[in-house]
A protein has these predicted regions:
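Active-site-adjacent loops and short helices of periplasmic peptidoglycan-processing enzymes
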Residues: 7-164, 173-174
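Gram-positive cell-envelope targeting signals
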Residues: 1-6
Length: 185
């Protein structure tokens, strides 16, 4: 055979240094795909998770929706709350009929508060009941320093997490095919 010789495969691990990185953020955590820590800065310090909350909102919703293509109507009464909190929207309008799938895309990709509030309303009957599901899921995942008070990430003293807990959540959520498809779109 005239095939060129092949190089032997190597499984040599390389050491990576992050000493040169200056992170402006108060907290940070970088892990590899398996969750092994590569870099951290105050990863256990409490933060307001803001729109990262929507990761939990989306994964809890996905786990409670049986038909992603079912149509639901956006309630009209949610827009006052969004305006009061200066929340972002995905651009849907009151009483518009859309699928659960569209609501999930709007929540994750556009950080749409109307999508999060609509999902919570249809799945649990109220935002508060949905938040209970979120906090139960956080405990189940071992997110030991996380507390949610709303589905959108609106700032509240009792709404907090850590970089470490958010990392746990994201690794879990990315294992779900639907979440992965939406998140990586």
């Amino acid at each position: 055979t005239d095939a060129p010789p092949t190089e032997p495969e190597t499984t040599e691990e390389r050491e990576i240094s992050f000493d040169f990185i200056e992170i402006e953020s108060e907290t940070a955590l970088l892990t590899d795909i398996d969750g092994n820590e590569l870099y951290s800065k105050n990863q256990y310090s409490r933060i307001y998770p803001a729109s990262l909350t929507k990761i939990m909102t989306a994964i809890v919703a996905i786990e409670h929706i049986s038909d992603l293509d079912e149509q639901i109507m956006i309630p009209g009464d949610i827009y006052d709350q969004i305006a009061y909190e200066n929340g972002s929207t995905a651009g849907f309008v009151a009483y518009e009929c859309v699928t659960y799938r569209d609501m999930l895309y709007g929540a994750v990709l556009s950080s749409g508060a109307e999508c999060c509030l609509t999902l919570a309303s249809y799945i649990s009957g109220s935002e508060w009941e949905f938040v209970e599901l979120m906090n139960s899921k956080a405990k189940e995942l071992g997110m030991s320093d996380t507390s949610f008070t709303n589905v959108c990430g609106f700032q509240n003293y009792e709404h907090y997490s850590t970089a470490s807990d958010i990392s746990l959540l994201l690794r879990y959520a990315l294992e779900n095919d639907t979440f992965y498809e939406i998140f990586t779109s």
